[in-house]
């Protein structure tokens, strides 16, 4: 049992109007996951046979469905704001040159905890549904090989 890889919680995940129930999720990014700014990076694991087909920032669907969704909080572990630009730019450039790298896109996330989207009051905006912008990153798995037209057994996967 590897506690750092355990999916400790379940949620319902909604994407383009489709609901994915009992999706496992956990925190990710080593010690940066506990940084004090309240933003967290997550890893979601979708259920067998119910994988979403995400699309890029241009609205084009990725070649394969994703079993995992890794998110980046877009803030460095030393408190610097990166907005995910370094990760996204690197991955885009690597893919453009024929070097396989994860697909990335930005998205906004909402965490529904109550009936009101943004409760009234001085602190209401911080108690509402809007969690913020995150960077979505494709996971290295068999679907990555298929999406990037790679042969199985090339040794890049753990």
Residue ranges and their predicted role:
Residues 1-158:
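Phosphate/dinucleotide-binding and metal-coordinating scaffold of catalytic cores
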């Amino acid at each position: 049992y590897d506690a750092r890889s355990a999916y400790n919680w379940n949620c319902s995940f909604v994407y383009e109007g489709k609901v994915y129930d009992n999706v496992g999720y956990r925190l990710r990014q080593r010690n940066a996951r506990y940084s004090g700014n309240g933003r967290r990076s997550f890893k979601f694991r979708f259920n067998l046979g119910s994988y979403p087909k995400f699309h890029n920032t241009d609205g084009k669907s990725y070649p394969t469905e994703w079993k995992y969704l890794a998110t980046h909080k877009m803030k460095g572990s030393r408190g610097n704001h990166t907005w995910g630009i370094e990760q996204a730019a690197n991955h885009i450039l690597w893919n453009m040159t024929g070097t396989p790298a994860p697909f990335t896109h930005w998205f906004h996330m909402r965490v529904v905890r109550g009936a009101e989207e943004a409760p009234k009051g001085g602190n209401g905006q911080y108690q509402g549904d809007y969690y913020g912008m995150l960077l979505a990153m494709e996971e290295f798995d068999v679907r990555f090989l298929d999406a990037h037209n790679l042969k199985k057994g090339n040794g890049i996967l753990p």
